[in-house]
Amino acid sequence: MGMDIHLQAGELAGWLNDAALPLWRQKGFDGEGGGFVETIDMKGEPTRDDRRSRVQPRQVYCFAAAGRRGWDGDWRTAAEGGLLYFDRVYGQPGGFYGALANADGKLIDASFDLYNQAFALLAFAHLAEVLPERGAEMVGRSDKLRRQLEARCKHPLAGFEEDDPPRLPLGSNPHMHLFEACLASEEVEGFDRVAWANLADEIAHLAMDRFIDAESGALREFFDHDWAPFPGEKGRIVEPGHLFEWAWLLLRWAERRGNAQAIVKARRLFEIGEKDGTCPDRDVVVMTLFDDFSVADPTARLWPQTEWLKAAIRFAALTEGAERERYLASAGRAAAALQRFLNVPVRGLWRDKQKADGSFVEEPAPASTFYHILCAIYELEDCLKRM
C-alpha cells in the first residue's frame, strides 16, 4: 500500500499544479472587478453567484501557499488582489469582516461571524510567510484583529462567544478554524508567538475538556453557554469530517507541545471517523452522525475526504511498523475517495456532493473547497517526506 500512496501523491500534485491552480487563477480570480468567484461551472466558466466572505481569505491562502511551494503561475496577483478585495468589499468600520457580497462587489450581508474572522487571520499568516516585505503589516493586522475578537466576544470560561451580545448555540467549528490560524501564526517570523501559542493552548484544552465527549471520545458541534452539549437533536450532531480535521490539528499541536493526551484524543477521533463516519459501500466519509454514531446524513461532500487524508497521513508519519502501514492504507483509501470527486470533464474542477446512491449532484464547483484540497495535497507531500 505504501507505494500506492506515493503514486496517488504524484497524481494529485500534477492535478494541482498543472490543472487546478492555473484554472482557478485564470477563471476563479475576477481580474476586472477583483476578488475570487464563488463557483466555476462544469464547463469551466465562472458564475455570478453571491460571494461568501470566507472564500476570499481561503483563496488568498491557496495562492500564497502555492507561491511558497514554488508554483510558477502568477500567484501573487491573486493573493494580494484577493486580500485587497476582501478588505474593500467585506471590511467593516469596526475592523471585522461582513458575511456576503454579490458578484458586483456590493456587500449584502454585513453580519459578524467568528468563522470568517478566523480565515482572515489564516490569510494574514500565510501572506506574511510568502511576502516578507508585507510581514510587519500582517503582524499589525493580525494582532489588531485578535485583540478585537477578544474584546468583542471572549467567552467567560474559555474560547469565544458566537457574537456580542451572545447567541446560542455556541459552536466548536469556529474554534477549529481559529486553532488552525493560531498554529499558523505562532510559526511566522515577527508574529506575537506568545499570544498565538497561548490562544492555541486555550482552544486545544477547551476541545479536549468540553468539545470532546469524555465517555465516547467524539467531538460535538453545538453547545450551551456553559460549554455543555446543546439540548435536543442539535447537541447530538457529530461531523466525521470535523473529527478528522480536529485530529489533524491536535496532532500538530501535540507534536509542538509534547502533549501525549492530545494524541490519545486525536487517535480516538480518527477511529470514530474511520469506523463510523465512512460509508462501507462507497468508501467515503459521510456528512453527519448523531452522538450514538448512527448516520444522520449519508451525503458525502468532498471536503471531509481531504480531512481524512490529512489526519491519516500525519498519523502515518508519527507512527511506525504495522501501525504506520494501517494509517498509510487509510490514507490511500482517503486519496482514492478524493480522486473520485476530482474526476470531472474539465480537469481542475470537482464535484462537491455525492448522494447516498453514489451519484453526484450536478452543480458548479465551489471555490471554498480548494483550501481543503490544496492543504491535503501539500500535507500528503510533507508527511511522505518525513517517512
From Swiss-Prot:
Catalytic reaction annotation: D-mannose 6-phosphate = D-fructose 6-phosphate
**SUPFAM superfamilies registered for this protein in UniProt:** Six-hairpin glycosidases
- What are its GO biological-process terms? carbohydrate metabolic process
The protein's enzyme class: isomerase
Q: Say yes or no: keyword Isomerase present.
A: yes
Q: What is its EC number?
A: 5.3.1.8
Q: Which domain of life is it from?
A: Bacteria
Is Isomerase a UniProt keyword of this protein? yes
Assigned keywords, A-Z: Isomerase
Quote one Gene Ontology molecular function term.
Answer: mannose-6-phosphate isomerase activity
Q: Which family does it belong to?
A: Belongs to the N-acylglucosamine 2-epimerase family.
PANTHER family registered for this protein in UniProt: N-ACYLGLUCOSAMINE-2-EPIMERASE (PTHR15108)
Name-wise, this protein is Mannose-6-phosphate isomerase
User: Which species is this UniProt entry from?
Assistant: Rhizobium meliloti (strain 1021) (Ensifer meliloti)
